Amino acid sequence: IHEAGGLVSVGVDVLSLGVIKPPGNYDVDFVIGEGQLLGNVPAAGGPLLGILASKYNRKWIQAIPGRLVGATNEMNSNSPGYCITLQTREQHIRREKATSNICTNESITAVNAAIYMAALGKRGFVELSQGLADRGHYLAGRLGEIDGVSAPLYQPFFSDFVVDFGNITHDVLEKECIERGFVPGIKFSDEGCKRLIAVSDLHSKEDLDNFVNVVKEVLQ
C-alpha cells in the first residue's frame, strides 16, 4: 500500500495489546480503537471513548479531531506535566474552523480509562490480556467439541470468536439460552446460525462451562 502511495490504518482491540505486538511495530500510519472497555461500563451504546493515533506527521496531527494533550516537563521542578497543545486548532482561536469542533467532549470516559490503566499497571494489563485470550480459546475449544457446532470459524482470534451452531435458528437459540440465563452472543450472519461470542474478565471457568452445558441442552 505504501509503495502505491497509500496510507495504512488498522483497527485494534486495545485489550489485546498486552499479548500481541502493537501497531507501531508493523509500520501502519493510523490506529483506531474503542476505549470504552478501559474501565467504562457497557452503557447501551454511549458515552464511548474513541482512540485515534498516527505516526508523527504535523499535517496529520493538525487535522485530527478533538483536543490534543501534550506531555512536557514543568519549568521549575522538571516533573512531568501535561497541557493542551497545538492550540491554534482550538475553538477559542479558530472559532468555527477549529478541528476540535468535530467531536463531542466526553472527557469523563477518558478519565475513567486513565484511572483504570493506572490501577492495572503494565503487569496487570498483560495479565488481563492473557486472561481474556485464555478464556476465549478455552470456550471456543469446549464449544467446538459439541456435535453439530463449529468453533471457532475464523483464526487467529483474541477473545471474541465466531461459532456456527448448526441447524438451529437464531431466534430459537436466543430464546432457549436466555430462558436459561445466558445470552448466546450476537448474530454474525444470516447464513446458518453463526454468532459472535465474547468473553470478559468477569467470566469464570464455571460460567464458561455452564454456558457450554446450556448449549448442549438446547441443541439436543
Which sequence ranges carry the predicted segments?
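Conserved C-terminal alpha-helix-loop-beta "cap" of PLP-dependent enzymes
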Residues: R123-N210
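Conserved PLP-enzyme active-site core in the AAT-like
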Residues: I1-G81, G148, V163, N167, ...
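Active-site C-terminal subdomain of aminotransferase-like
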Residues: L38-D147, A151-Y154
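C-terminal alpha-helix
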Residues: V214-V218
